[in-house]
Amino acid sequence: MTLTKETRVTLNDGNMMPILGLGTYASPHVPKSLAEEAVKIAIDVGYRHIDCAFITGNEMHIGNGIRSKISDGTVKREDIFYTGKLWCTYFSPEMVRKGLERSLRDVGMDYLDLFLMHWPVSLKPSGASDPSDKDKPFIYDNVDLCATWEALEARKDAGLVRSLGVSNFNRRQLERILNKPGLKYKPVCNQVECHVYLNQNKLHSYCKSKDIVLVTYSVLGSHRDRNWVDLSLPVLLDDPILNKVAAKYNRTSAEIAMRFILQKGIVVLAKSFTPARIKQNLGVFEFELKPEDMKSLESLDRNLHYGPFREVKQHPEYPFHDEY
């Protein structure tokens, strides 16, 4: 199948997700206003899939950007596929509605196209909420993931969410949701870190077998935010083999890294606040990697997580103790 910026994948609930989306995470020192401008530019050049999360603290700016492009007639609300995420401190069933409604209020929408459980680890709101919160410890909670899922299903029934999914779940955790007695809605996707150094082949194969779409963040090897990433790790885009393939196609290493994942049938979220790069990333639809180059890039896998969220490594639901 020829891939274009208009290509969408059909989710297991019948809704459609664009195969390329704009990631909007920004490290704390980056002005939140840049996210708003990035969204406007992305929509102008053809992006229709915008991914955000409560924990990034910029949903209000993302919403401003989307609404401005609706107001000027560039798009209609139904043209946009917007993803939000329920943070780990909102996993108690009685907190799920509050977490969702806060995102709806911040982004200024009546509904979200997709709402994800951000990580499979429940945290108590009285402790730290993310790794940049240095003044508090993380306080683990023991909320049953299935109980959170049931509360999310109720929000879908209420019309506040079109599709439900998960993020950073391993196979065992996915199976727990899928095997839940009385399950009403399967997760439509699992959003995970995935790139040439972490190709996620086993998890991808499992998800496909269950009609769950794999979506990738950090496709370019992640931002270099020391709150989340070990800065001693190699810079993915400097990889010699990746750059050799890029030279062969007269493309950037970023374009090759994204095209590799897209050709594997995985939805890609490309994060950038730089106008030129936002436009350049659409170049992934202008070429196709040959089988021998796909094979060469497959060989780069080293099971490397740039963002393993080690701060919760002792949590009983920490996902990366399992193989996949």
Swiss-Prot record:
Keyword Acetylation appears in the UniProt entry: yes
Residues binding NADP(+): 218-281
Signal peptide range in chain numbering: none
Modified residues (N-acetylthreonine): 2
Pfam families xrefs: Aldo_ket_red
CDD domains: AKR_AKR1C1-35
GO MF assignments: oxidoreductase activity; structural constituent of eye lens
Keywords on record: Acetylation, Eye lens protein
PANTHER family found in the cross-reference section: ALDO/KETO REDUCTASE (PTHR11732)
Family affiliation: Belongs to the aldo/keto reductase family.
Complexes and interactors: Monomer.
Name of the molecule in the record: Rho crystallin
Taxonomic lineage of the native organism: Eukaryota, Metazoa, Chordata, Craniata, Vertebrata
